[in-house]
């Protein structure tokens, strides 16, 4: 059963994505779609994560990335620094005991963006570190307390891509380790 906070996050994320997608699809149809990931590019986005942490069926999160350096000696790619956060929540019960879990992974990755001839597609791979904020409680008729889990540092490895369907908006997806197994969402260009 999802918490009311998790339901509110899902509703707000869905509403923002629907409004943004509608506006950007109209703009893309008017202007024609072209990708533009390059030096100085900055975006922000929302994602839904699937798989990866305990009994959570989905997570909700955000992404921010800034392209900081051209790498002519490494295939002429671009180095981007990405900050990410996600929110997972779930509960379970068994033989009179109930558990409640909340995970909030916050991480930073260095992403290498491959240069392709197709400007609408932006593939990347990334490595980084994160900090997992964990809250877990157990309760029964005779005992209430924590679950013994603690927050801590974790490693991140991911591969993903953007597909630009307008100059300022892209579909986003990544797979990897460190949080959700699969994240999908939408990013919006800021600069």
Spell out what each predicted region is.
Residues 29-40, 69-79, 115-122, 165-169, ...:
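Short loop/turn motifs that connect adjacent beta-strands in outer-membrane beta-barrel proteins
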Residues 33, 49-53, 72-74, 94-99, ...:
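Outer-membrane beta-barrel domain signature
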Residues 58-139:
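Gram-negative (and chloroplast) outer-membrane scaffold detector with strong preference
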Residues 46-50, 62-66, 108-112, 127-131, ...:
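Residues on the lipid-exposed face of transmembrane beta-strands in outer-membrane beta-barrel proteins
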Residues 42-52, 80-87, 127-129, 163-179:
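Transmembrane beta-strand segments that form the barrel wall of outer-membrane beta-barrel proteins
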């Amino acid at each position: 059963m999802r918490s009311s906070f998790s339901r509110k996050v899902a509703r707000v994320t869905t509403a923002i994505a629907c409004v943004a997608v509608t506006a950007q699809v109209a703009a893309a149809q008017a202007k024609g779609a072209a990708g533009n990931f390059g030096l100085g590019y900055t975006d922000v986005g929302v994602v839904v994560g699937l798989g990866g942490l305990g009994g959570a069926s989905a997570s909700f999160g955000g992404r921010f990335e800034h392209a900081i350096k051209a790498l002519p000696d490494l295939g002429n790619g671009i180095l981007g620094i990405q900050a990410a956060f996600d929110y997972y929540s779930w509960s379970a019960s068994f033989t009179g005991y109930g558990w409640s879990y909340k995970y909030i992974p916050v991480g930073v990755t260095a992403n290498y963006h491959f240069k392709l001839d197709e400007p609408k597609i932006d593939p990347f791979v990334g490595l980084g570190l994160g900090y997992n904020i964990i809250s877990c409680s157990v309760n029964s008729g005779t005992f209430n307390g924590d679950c013994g889990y603690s927050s801590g540092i974790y490693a991140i490895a991911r591969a993903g891509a953007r597909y630009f369907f307008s100059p300022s908006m892209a579909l986003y997806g990544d797979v990897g380790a460190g949080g959700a197994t699969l994240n999908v969402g939408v990013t919006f260009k800021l600069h």
